[in-house]
UniProtKB/Swiss-Prot annotation:
Protein name: Uncharacterized HIT-like protein BU357
InterPro entries cross-referenced by the UniProt entry: Histidine_triad_CS, Histidine_triad_HIT, HIT-like, HIT-like_sf
Organism: Buchnera aphidicola subsp. Acyrthosiphon pisum (strain APS)
Lineage: Bacteria, Pseudomonadati, Pseudomonadota, Gammaproteobacteria, Enterobacterales
CDD domains attached to this UniProt entry: PKCI_related
A Pfam family of this chain: HIT
UniProt cross-references to Gene3D superfamilies, sorted A to Z: HIT-like
Length: 114
């Protein structure tokens, strides 16, 4: 799994990224290796390793991440045709960076899991 410092640097704007949304709680930016015409990563502005580390004190961040994902889907005009929201957890779940992040994908018909 990759080091999480890349996300920290994006949040602090120390490295270039196409940030589409940022507030005091989260940052959302375009994936540099998109899997769909719209591929946005949504991350907390504070470190959480994976969804396994969600607890009573920080569970509110998931709600905010989903809320902003829907807001961005509307902004990108993919909300009517449809989109996918994914959170990978740990190695077997496909998580590549040791930092909780949500993928928002859309802009084309996505393959089903069947």
């Amino acid at each position: 799994m990759q080091d999480n410092s890349i996300f920290k640097n994006i949040i602090q704007r120390k490295i270039p990224a196409n940030i589409v949304y940022q507030d005091k709680k989260i940052t959302a930016f375009e994936d540099i290796k998109p899997k769909a015409p719209v591929h946005i990563l949504i991350i907390p502005n504070f470190f959480i390793s994976s969804s396994n580390d969600i607890n009573k004190k920080n569970k509110w961040i998931m709600s905010h991440m989903f809320y902003i994902a829907v807001k961005i889907a509307k902004q990108k005009k993919i909300n009517q045709e449809g989109y996918r929201i994914i959170i990978n957890c740990n190695e077997y779940g496909g998580q590549e960076i040791n930092y909780l992040h949500m993928h928002l994908l859309g802009g084309k018909k996505l393959k089903s899991f069947s």
